[in-house]
Amino acid sequence: MSTNHIQPLLDLLYQGKSLSREQAFEIFSALIRGEMSEATMAGMLVALKIRGETIDEISGAADAMRAAAKTFPYSNGDNLGNGIVDIVGTGGDGFNTINISTTAAFVAAAAGAKVAKHGNRSVSSKSGSSDLLAQFGIDLTMSPDTASRCLDALNLCFLFAPHYHGGVKHAGPVRQALKTRTLFNVLGPLINPARPEFMLLGVYSPELVLPIAKVLKALGTKRAMVVHGSGLDEVALHGNTLVAELKDGDIIEYQLTPADLGVPLAQISDLEGGEPAQNALITEAILRGRGTDAHANAVAINAGCALYVCGIADSVKAGTLLALSTIQSGKAFELLSQLAKVSSETKE
C-alpha cells in the first residue's frame, strides 16, 4: 500500500498548511481507492481537524466522493435543471429526536417537491433515516434504477449512502477508532448521487452554517438553506435557527424563529424520539395527520423550508402552511405506502 504519490500533500498537512481543492481531491481519491494505510488516514484526518478544514478542502473531498460514486441514472451528471431537493442533516447533534427530516421528506414530496433523500444508518439518534424506513418495509438497498423509478412515479426516493459510496468503507475503522468528529461528518450531505439542485441542509454546529453554504456554492448547488436550530441539525421549533441561504450565487445570513414560520414555540423534550419501532409509530401518526401539534409543526417547518428552497412556496411561512395542510390531508402517508410497494417490487 504505497502513498508515495500523495506524501508531499500529507507533508503539507502535517506542517499545518492548507490544500487546494485539487490537492484535496487527489488525497481523498487515494483514500477511496484503498491506497492509504489506516495510520496515514488517521494522521490526515486529525491534521485537517486540528487546523480546521477550509472551503477548498471540503469541496475537494466532496468532489472525490462524487466522482467515485455509483451513478444515479436520474441525474444528468450536473446540477442543471433536475429540480431535485434533498432535506438532510449531518447528524451528530447529540439529541435523540424523532426523525424530523425523513418525515419532512414525505411531506415535501406529497406537496409537490421532487425529493431524493440521501441517508445512512443512525449517527446520533437511536433511529436514523434508514432504520426508520426499514420499519415501513422500504427497501434500503433498492437499486439505482428502482430509486430512479420511485422518483419519477412518486416524487420521492431514498438513496442509501453505502450503496453509492463503496470507497468510504476504507475509512470506517479509523473513524470509529478516533471517536471524534472528522471531515467525514460533514461530507455525507454533500455527496448525494442525485446531485440535487436544491438543499435544506442541517449542521450540528453553528460554526458550520456559513462554511457549508460556501461549499454548496462551490459545488454548484443552485439554491440552499444551511441551518442550525438551537443545538439541532434542522430548523428548530424550540428556539432560533441560524440560516445561511444561497440564492442567485449570493449567501445571506439571518435567523428564523418559530413565529417567523407561523407556528408556536415548543420544548425540545416534546420532540424526543425512541427506538426505530417507536419512531415509526410517531412518523405514521404525523403523516396520517394524527400527530401531536409539536411533532406536526416540527416536520412542517422543515418541509416548508424545503418547499421554499425549491420554489414551490414563495416564503418559508407559506411553505410551512402548505406542509401543514399536506399533513392534514393524509397524502404524505399514502406516499409512504406507495414507496414501500414500489421500492420492494424489484429487489436485486
UniProtKB/Swiss-Prot annotation:
Keywords: Amino-acid biosynthesis, Aromatic amino acid biosynthesis, Glycosyltransferase, Magnesium, Metal-binding, Transferase, Tryptophan biosynthesis
GO molecular function: anthranilate phosphoribosyltransferase activity; magnesium ion binding
GO cellular component, one term: cytosol
Reported function: Catalyzes the transfer of the phosphoribosyl group of 5-phosphorylribose-1-pyrophosphate (PRPP) to anthranilate to yield N-(5'-phosphoribosyl)-anthranilate (PRA).
Residues at which anthranilate 1 binds: 89, 120
NCBIfam families assigned to the protein according to its UniProt record, in alphabetical order: trpD (TIGR01245)
Protein's gene: trpD
Cofactor note: Binds 2 magnesium ions per monomer.
Family: Belongs to the anthranilate phosphoribosyltransferase family.
Pathway as given in its UniProt record: Amino-acid biosynthesis; L-tryptophan biosynthesis; L-tryptophan from chorismate: step 2/5
Classification via HAMAP family: TrpD (MF_00211)
Chain positions recorded as Mg(2+) 2 binding sites: 233-234
Protein name (record): Anthranilate phosphoribosyltransferase
Domain of life assignment: Bacteria
